Amino acid sequence: MTLPASLKGFETLDIFNISSVRNICELNKHAEHVSIKNLPLIDISVGNDDVWFHLEDGTIVNGKSYKSICEKTLGFLGFIGIILLDSEDTLEEIRLSKTQCKRRIIYLILKEDTEFLLCGIVYALENLPIKGQTLLKLRDIIKKISVTLPVSKLLACTCQKLISILRYIFYDDKQQDVLDKVPPIIQLYYESKTANIHMLNLFFKSHDNDDTCTLSLNTRRLQDDSKYLIDFLKSAICDAFSKEYKMTEIEKTSLH
């Protein structure tokens, strides 16, 4: 397992506790052009102790068979993601410079069905509306998944963390096992934000709140860039791959 240089000083156990792999996208090749796109998931459900992915074409597939779906997709090269420390996502911006962000982009080389399943779950947790009971069922299923490889451990820990954040923000779940997985910076930001809203409502009798909270990083900005993250990533990936599909600008990082 090769980690970005900025993370190499931590013990392995610490890495899984304080970092996540976020903003997972598909990497695709068409002719000589390499690009990224969203996963084709529009919903996620849990039934019969299995995770089910609802795809754009109307089909519903068992999460464990998602690997075969991906491998049959024309031009599919794998997934990319971004390694973030807990202190770097404030729910408003990403506390990375453009240079730092490039070094955090990882090319996920996956082999196991479970790894594809976990990538799909991470994407769903960040981008899709998910019911509270579904979150609880997902949490229970992920706990039962046997993970041995570093990439699987990181993806599973990311799923557990995102589930806890969603439970905390959208369902006001403040049980200790939930709070233990919610990064302190998110707790601080969210509590201060809700306190300000309560104060405004108290004095001005206003219950309107247009500030919606989302875990998707696509519309977040980096510290020194006015671009949305998704636009930055598209540009970085385009620059990174030559016609022979070799990494140039960004440091290619494999978790295997």
From Swiss-Prot:
Keyword flag DNA-binding: no
Keyword annotations: Host cytoplasm, Host Golgi apparatus, Virion, Virion tegument
GO cellular component: a single term: viral tegument
Broad class of where this protein is predominantly found: virion
Top-level lineage group: Viruses
Localization: Virion; Virion tegument; Host cytoplasm; Host Golgi apparatus
Signal peptide: none
Keyword DNA-binding: no
InterPro entries (UniProt xref): Herpes_UL7
Pfam families named in the record: Herpes_UL7
Family: Belongs to the herpesviridae cytoplasmic envelopment protein 1 family.
HAMAP family for the chain: HSV_CEP1
Entry function: Plays a critical role in cytoplasmic virus egress. Participates in the final step of tegumentation and envelope acquisition within the host cytoplasm.
Protein name in UniProt: Cytoplasmic envelopment protein 1
Organism in which the protein naturally occurs: Human herpesvirus 7 (strain JI) (HHV-7)
Gene from which the chain derives: U75
